[in-house]
Swiss-Prot record:
Disulfide bonds: none annotated. InterPro entries: FAD/NAD-bd_sf, GIDA_C_N, MnmG, MnmG-rel, MnmG-rel_CS, MnmG_C, MnmG_C_subdom, MnmG_C_subdom_sf. It comes from the Bacteria. Its cofactor is FAD. It is found in: Cytoplasm. This is tRNA uridine 5-carboxymethylaminomethyl modification enzyme MnmG. Homodimer. Heterotetramer of two MnmE and two MnmG subunits. PROSITE patterns: GIDA_1, GIDA_2. NAD(+) binds at residues 276-290. HAMAP family: MnmG_GidA. The lineage of its organism: Bacteria, Bacillati, Bacillota, Bacilli, Lactobacillales. NAD-binding protein involved in the addition of a carboxymethylaminomethyl (cmnm) group at the wobble position (U34) of certain tRNAs, forming tRNA-cmnm(5)s(2)U34.
Length: 625
């Protein structure tokens, strides 16, 4: 085969999955090529101008802990930062940043361009080149006929695979934001034999900032107290000059406009055939599914410091443009708003994810990986997490090293990938805290404690990040030791001080840690009694200490459950398993096992339609092997 150039890893698509995949592979020493349709759209945000949010924000922290880039990049380019769910328990707290979308993309492109071992190139890949047995990928062919050799290929094409934009009755071939649609590669994947699904997502109109009457909306400022996505970011660099978002609502008039035009809605007229996201429905879908609700929240989100475009969060629509004009003007604060871009729906092909291994390598073709919306997920963060895992595993495969699989108990990224490859998805998959059975362990504050050592082992965490992490953990250990040794004694002045703070008297001496276990007590109050540490304790260390001590009992119970699951995960299933030999299992279970081909007993137990009796039979069979 005559190749123009040869690479270890080729990544197809420069979105959020593609940049993480290519950076990970290159940083692990693989000669990497990132091919993208348009160099001006590297790490572009075609929909919401934000990073993070419920569950997603924890994913960004996990990416950072493993040595990925998304957290660092948003910490350099945000215009607002806000911690969500602060009134709830630590398991569901998550950070969200409003991004300057142009700055975010430009900064990430610079990072990719400057990365050693990584080549960034514009081009459209139309075909995967396979070996003579059609079992292994050995390269790619572009629309110009140029061929590049590769030991591994990662497809991260987002919504571009046979993408079609829909606005009212208008439907045309396009990727996101009027970029080119990737039709040749979509055809090629079908020809190779992959099962392809068709999904849909959408985006709202953008309006001119200076045409908004903000007096009719509610201001939504960022947090004054510092927070960051990257564990390497400093509180000293926290942005003080933040830009607010604004809250408004749909009205009964808005709903009337939509109801009167539902016959023209592509979602209901049959023009849209792809399956849309359950947790991010269009406004026309909302007023139909939730007809009893008199109004729906809308967030006016600035897209950056140097643009007048404002994103109307919550108003995703593919209604005809004339309907969108009327709809926007029916919203308080937007009566005189000038629409800059109409909302649209986009349909695209997806590789149904049950065809993937937990490494995100395809079962059908060796050396071929897929990540991001190509796998049926929604969201920049979900895409980036998958891209990181695919990039790591592509590099490890080439190096002949053990594969990298995150457990459900280790990361939200592990939960997501296990859900995709074990259960599959029939609609755009979104991460939710409710999907994680061990969410008290998978918190915002402990992502580095969970994953930095793992990232170091695979060769992705830098020396600087590793030293920073070790210093933090050493301080954590020292202060935990102090809290478990220093005591509050039942002396008169202690009892008086407790009374003034609203606490009852103590009968016996308590360690600082025992006192902190009380749900109404915080770290600063403990310090009032036992004194300051001989060093300045980092804010993030204090946060970790408070959670670990206050929820110690619950965390221990969760860890006991994790140990039970790990015993199931340790029981491997042979790759060439003959499922027909299991005569006693239910027919549905046998069919699911054949389709998914689970790799461990634990994975088999999580397949929908498989009951405990089937797992018991499988366990007996494996123990007899």
């Amino acid at each position: 085969m005559n190749f123009q150039e040869n690479y270890d890893v080729i990544v197809i698509g420069g979105g959020h999955a593609g940049v993480e995949a290519s950076l990970a592979a290159a940083r692990m020493g693989s000669k990497t090529l990132l091919m993208t349709i348009n160099l001006n759209m590297v790490a572009f945000m075609p929909c919401n101008p934000s990073i993070g949010g419920s569950a997603k924000g924890i994913v960004v922290r996990e990416i950072d802990a493993l040595g990925g880039e998304m957290g660092r990049n948003i910490d350099k380019t945000y215009i607002q930062m806000k911690m969500l769910n602060t009134g709830k328990g630590p398991a569901v707290r998550a950070l969200r940043a409003q991004a300057d979308k142009d700055e975010y993309a430009a900064s990430m492109k610079n990072t990719v361009s400057d990365q050693e071992n990584l080549t960034l190139r514009q081009g459209m890949v139309e075909e995967l080149i396979l070996d003579d047995e059609k079992q292994k990928v050995i390269g790619v062919r572009t629309s110009t006929g140029t061929q590049y050799g590769a030991k591994a290929v990662i497809i991260t094409t987002g919504t571009a695979l046979r993408g079609e934009i829909i606005i009212g009755e208008l439907k045309y071939s396009s990727g996101p934001n009027n970029s080119l649609s990737s039709i040749g590669l979509a055809d090629n994947l079908r020809e190779i034999g992959f099962e392809i699904g068709r999904f849909k997502t959408g985006t709202p109109p953008r309006v001119l900032a200076s045409s908004i009457d903000y007096d009719k909306t509610e201001i939504q400022p960022g947090d004054e107290a510092p927070n960051h996505f990257s564990f390497m970011s400093s509180d000293e660099d926290y942005l003080k000059d933040q830009i607010p978002c604004w809250l408004t609502y749909t009205t009964e008039n808005s709903h009337t406009i939509l109801r009167d035009n539902l016959h023209r809605a592509p979602l209901f007229s049959g023009i849209v055939k792809g399956v849309g996201p359950r947790y991010c429905p269009s406004i026309e879908d909302k007023i139909t599914r939730f007809a009893d609700k008199p109004r729906h929240q809308l967030f006016l989100e600035p897209e950056g410091r140097n643009t007048e475009e404002v994103y109307i969060g919550g108003l995703s629509t593919s209604m005809p443009e004339d309907v969108q004009f009327d709809l926007v003007k029916s919203i308080p604060g937007l009566e005189n708003a000038k629409m800059m871009r109409p909302g649209y729906a986009i349909e695209y092909d997806v590789v149904m994810p049950h065809q993937l291994r937990p490494t995100l390598e395809t079962k059908l073709i060796s050396g071929l990986f897929t990540a991001g919306q190509t796998n049926g997920t929604s969201g920049y963060e979900e895409a980036a997490g998958q891209g990181l895992v695919a990039g790591i595993n592509a590099a490890l495969k080439i190096q002949g090293k053990p594969e990298f699989i995150l457990k459900r108990s280790e990361a939200y990224i592990g939960v997501m990938i296990d859900d995709l490859v074990t259960k599959g998805t029939l609609e755009p998959y979104r991460l939710l805290t409710s999907r994680a059975e061990y969410r008290l362990i998978l918190r915002h504050d402990n992502a580095d404690r969970r994953l930095t050592e793992i990232g170091r082992q695979v060769g992705l965490v830098s020396d600087a990040q590793w030293e920073h992490y070790q210093a933090k953990m050493a301080q954590f250990d020292r202060e935990m030791k102090r809290l478990n040794s220093e005591k509050l004694k039942p002396l008169p002045d202690t009892q008086e001080k407790l009374g003034k703070l609203g606490f009852g008297p103590i009968k016996d001496a308590l360690t600082g840690a025992e006192f902190l276990k009380r749900p109404e007590v915080n770290y600063d109050e403990v310090i009032d009694f036992i004194g300051q540490a001989p060093e300045v304790i980092d804010r993030t260390v204090i946060e970790l200490i408070e959670t670990e001590i206050t929820y110690e009992g619950y965390i221990k119970k969760a860890m006991d459950q994790v140990d039970k699951m790990h015993r199931l995960e340790a029981k491997r299933i042979p790759k060439n398993m003959d499922w027909d030999k299991l005569d006693s299992i239910a027919t549905e279970a046998r069919q699911k096992f054949k389709k998914i081909n689970p790799e461990t007993l634990g994975q088999a137990s999580r397949i929908s339609g498989v009951n405990p009796a089937d797992i018991s039979i499988l366990m007996v069979y494996l123990e007899g092997k």
